[in-house]
Curated annotation (Swiss-Prot):
Disulfide bonds: none annotated. Catalyzes the GTP-dependent ribosomal translocation step during translation elongation. During this step, the ribosome changes from the pre-translocational (PRE) to the post-translocational (POST) state as the newly formed A-site-bound peptidyl-tRNA and P-site-bound deacylated tRNA move to the P and E sites, respectively. Catalyzes the coordinated movement of the two tRNA molecules, the mRNA and conformational changes in the ribosome. It holds the Pfam family EFG_C. The gene is eef2b. The lineage of its organism: Eukaryota, Metazoa, Chordata, Craniata, Vertebrata. Residues 17-362 form the tr-type G domain. Keywords: Cytoplasm, Elongation factor, GTP-binding, Hydrolase, Nucleotide-binding, Nucleus, Protein biosynthesis. This is Elongation factor 2b. It is found in: Cytoplasm; Nucleus. It catalyses: GTP + H2O = GDP + phosphate + H(+). It comes from Danio rerio.
Length: 858
């Protein structure tokens, strides 16, 4: 079944209960791409001999060179289960052939937006953890995202070869290591997931059920408890039991699996399982997992790595491993690889785990629909998604754009949730800003071609039914990054993805040769398409700004821009950080502004948010879409707001969703509602560009205390009210002790203990502070967690490596905003310097504008 044709894949696509859409997620360098190779080779796409070295899914040249995954890549594989294995599947199934759509995603935190895009189109995730270093910060971030999207995880403990060969652990220690990782992962799942009564049921991972795999991607071997349970069931079976039916056999194997993990012990003399650790004569029994599973593996490793020829031959015969003739002459590591691959093939174990335990689209879309679809839960589109109905209206989500070999064109990459997408079908293409009933951000166009994504290749295909992952040609001109494609007139959008990091680092770019400007603009447009996270902004001064998640992310983006998208030489500025403006006290006076015609007056004050509220708005716990009373209740209970005020929040800003509020605390003002729209517009404008240096505001609450208006409607139109509202908001900000906020990274550094001192030195120089330091159990490694201002993080990795002899590995991820100490109005302070630089860069007037510009006297 090596080169299966498109027609064969197409035939399985209709069996939607036999499709598995899954992504591989993990911390950077825990071996995702290497592990994916075992799966790909099992499905017969690359030669099994090279699996583990090819990294088939790293398609770009820079990915191969740097040995990191940068873009997520999709690949479709076919896998057939035997009769016996089919019995283990608890959901509905249709035949024994399975189509597995696998997406290999990057582990590096700067590319976590790629992971988000991958998660949206899949239903299950294979979480890979390096069993030596355990659960790291990125594992947690990504797993948290997966659970928020209601994606079912299964776990793979990778790099067991390191645990055996480098650390030389005892079987019992290794068991404890595994047990600890399983517990850590389950803690994360239970913290962020819904409880067992939720729509997904119990999603905790448990080796006993078979949702945990162990193995080594590099050597190409892996197993779950199921594989060993099957061996032992066959071994202990008496002669008459050989003809068991698959269902009975399945039950026996499942019973056996329960005995192979946890506090179960094996009495080798009597050949019995017991639950007590000590026998009657006081001698300790070995744990079943150590004795029956790890011990054989240890024996194989020991015999081969110590070149014990006779023992090796005996073991190979006993384990019934058939080696090729060329493998028989190998010794040492090459022989070890060959033997382990034959005995416990990784592809087999993992593909079984995926098909048995991950949900099919039919199962998953039932509980994912409410999270995916913005519209009502009972319209045609929602019903189509819930039932994964090929006869329903087409509903498809595009999660990212993939550049084609043809410069400047993109494949739209996404998943069909309901209906069928086919070549030449006329569809509605809806961007993220589309609202039902309006015409903006909506195009009616035919799809030119539908294609199948296969890692480095694409295959044309006639049509694709729901539950599958697909690429579209000819849609890229109408969407920027993501969007919904549908044939249903009243369809709402699919929800926009929430990214776990935000673009806080910016670089200004310009063309070296001014004549190339049009190419640069075109290139920036393409760059914005090709990366789910990056933002391209044009400042008023005419500068082109690129914003990304971190240094590495920006470096890759700029390289892409220069080589692929714009194809011109560029000049780049040093990286700059975006700041936020805020206030630190209540306004010291009531601020008044009069409208240009002197007939209307607005009175307002500003004050800071209580701690934690801005973060709640970012997370979406408090939002403009909530029901009034629930929101008021939440604010009253958690932040002790007055309920009357909490009910009269006019809006959030900037962009209607940001972490600032406009609250109406007036009593009985005439015509107030008629100017609401104008004041809100002024508020959105002011919070987007604050008074200090035109950066976004954050965590400011503006209270409208009183309004006097002209009785005549013509004298209080938008032209009178909007600029007035903006001026009074600026006055409020400047009278309430304005401050700047800077973004802070959470840095996790793994290092041996002898270099911890060097790390403290680097962090102190860069205004960082350590808030946690712990030792990884059973290893000489320390984990240091610290907060580091993004502004100081440039060159941090290089600095750290040079001070620790290259032994420390940092991971930076954006964590929170923090107020910069010092008053921006005081000429000697650091914030004042930053404000001056920013204003100069943006081409604004020097110095913070005087209060008199905004404040009027009665």
């Amino acid at each position: 079944m090596v080169n299966f044709t498109v027609d064969q894949i197409r035939a399985i696509m209709d069996k939607k209960s036999n499709i598995r859409n899954m992504s591989v997620i993990a911390h950077v360098d825990h071996g995702k791409s290497t592990l994916t190779d075992s799966l790909v080779s099992k499905a017969g796409i690359i030669a099994s001999a090279r699996a583990g070295e090819t990294r088939f899914t790293d398609t770009r040249k820079d990915e191969q060179e740097r040995c990191i995954t940068i873009k997520s890549t999709a690949i479709s594989m076919y896998y057939e289960l035997t009769e016996n294995d089919l019995a283990f599947i608890k959901q509905c199934k249709d035949g024994s052939g399975f189509l597995i759509n696998l997406i290999d995603s990057p582990g590096h935190v700067d590319f976590s937006s790629e992971v988000t895009a991958a998660l949206r189109v899949t239903d299950g995730a294979l979480v890979v953890v390096d069993c030596v270093s355990g659960v790291c910060v990125q594992t947690e971030t990504v797993l948290r995202q997966a659970i928020a999207e209601r994606i079912k995880p299964v776990l793979m403990m990778n790099k067991m070869d390191r645990a055996l060969l480098e650390l030389q652990l005892e079987p019992e220690e290794l068991y404890q290591t595994f047990q600890r990782i399983v517990e850590n992962v389950n803690v994360i799942i239970s913290t962020y997931g819904e409880d067992e009564g939720g729509p997904m049921g119990n999603i905790m991972i448990d080796p006993v059920i078979g949702t945990v795999g162990f193995g080594s991607g590099l050597h190409g071997w892996a197993f779950t408890l199921k594989q060993f349970a099957e061996m032992y069931v066959a071994k202990f079976a008496s002669k008459g039991e050989a003809q068991l039916s698959p269902a009975d056999r399945c039950k026996k194997v499942e019973d056996m699996m329960k005995k192979l993990w946890g506090d179960r012990y094996f009495d080798p003399a009597g050949g019995k399982f017991t639950k007590t650790a000590n026998g009657p004569d006081g001698k300790k029994y070995p744990r079943t997992f150590a004795q029956l599973i790890l011990d054989p593996i240890f024996k194989v490793f020991d015999a081969i790595m110590n070149f014990k020829k006779e023992e090796t031959a005996k073991l190979i015969e006993k384990l019934d491993i058939k080696l090729d003739t060329e493998d028989k002459d190998k010794e040492g590591k090459p022989l070890l690889k060959a033997v382990m691959r034959r005995w416990l093939p990784a592809g087999e174990a993992l593909l079984q785990m995926i098909t048995i335990h991950l949900p099919s689209p039919v199962t998953a879309q039932k509980y994912r629909c409410e999270l995916l679809y913005e519209g009502p839960g009972d319209d045609e589109a929602a019903m189509g998604i819930k039932n994964c109905d090929p006869k329903g209206p087409l509903m498809m989500y595009i999660s990212k754009m993939v550049p084609t070999t043809d410069k400047g064109r993109f494949y739209a990459f996404g998943r069909v949730f309901s209906g069928v997408v086919s070549t030449g079908l006329k569809v509605r293409i809806m961007g993220p800003n589309y609202t039902p009933g309006k015409k903006e951000d909506l195009y009616l166009k035919p799809i030119q071609r539908t294609i199948l994504m296969m890692g480095r290749y694409v295959e044309p295909i006639e049509d694709v039914p729901c539950g599958n992952i697909v690429g579209l040609v000819g849609v890229d001109q109408f969407l920027v990054k993501t969007g919904t494609i549908t044939t249903f007139d009243q369809a709402h959008n699919m929800r926009v993805m929430k990214f776990s990091v935000s673009p806080v680092v910016r670089v200004a770019v310009e063309a070296k040769n001014p004549a190339d400007l049009p190419k640069l603009v075109e290139g920036l447009k393409r760059l914005a398409k090709s990366d789910p996270m990056v933002q391209c902004i044009i400042e008023e001064s005419g500068e082109h700004i690129i914003a990304g998640a971190g240094e590495l992310h920006l470096e890759i983006c700029l390289k892409d821009l220069e080589e692929d998208h714009a194809c011109i030489p560029l000049k780049k500025s040093d990286p700059v950080v975006s700041y936020r403006e805020t206030v630190s006290a209540e306004s010291d006076q009531m601020c008044l502004s009069k409208s240009p015609n002197k007939h209307n007056r607005l009175y307002m004050k500003a004050r800071p948010f209580p701690d934690g509220l801005a973060e709640d708005i970012d997370k979406g716990d408090v939002s403009s879409r909530q029901e009034l009373k629930t929101r008021a209740r939440y604010l009253a209970d958690k932040y002790e707001w007055e309920v009357t005020e909490a009910r009269k929040i006019w809006c959030f800003g900037p962009d209607g969703t940001g972490p600032n509020m406009l609250v109406d605390v007036t009593k009985g003002v005439q015509y107030l509602n008629e100017i609401k729209d104008s004041v809100v517009a002024g508020f959105q404008w002011a919070t987007k560009e604050g008074a200090l240096c035109e950066e976004n505001m954050r965590a400011v609450r503006f209270d409208i205390h009183d309004v006097t208006l002209h009785t005549d409607a013509i004298h209080r139109g938008g032209g009178q009210i909007i600029p007035t509202a903006r001026r009074v908001l600026y006055a409020c900000q400047l009278t309430a002790e304005p401050r700047l906020m800077e973004p802070i990274y959470l840095v996790e550094i793994q290092c041996p203990e002898q270099v911890v001192g060097g790390i403290y030195g680097v962090l102190n120089r860069k205004r960082g502070h350590v808030f946690e330091e712990s030792q990884v159990m059973g290893t000489p490694m320390f984990v240091v967690k610290a907060y580091l201002p993004v502004n100081e993080s440039f060159g941090f990795t290089a600095d750290l490596r040079s001070n620790t002899g290259g032994q420390a590995f940092p991971q930076c991820v954006f964590d929170h905003w923090q107020i910069l100490p010092g008053d921006p109005k005081d000429a000697a302070s650091k914030p004042c310097q930053i404000v001056a630089d920013t204003r100069k860069r943006k081409g604004l007037k020097e110095g913070i504008p005087a209060l008199d510009n905004f404040l009027d006297k009665l």
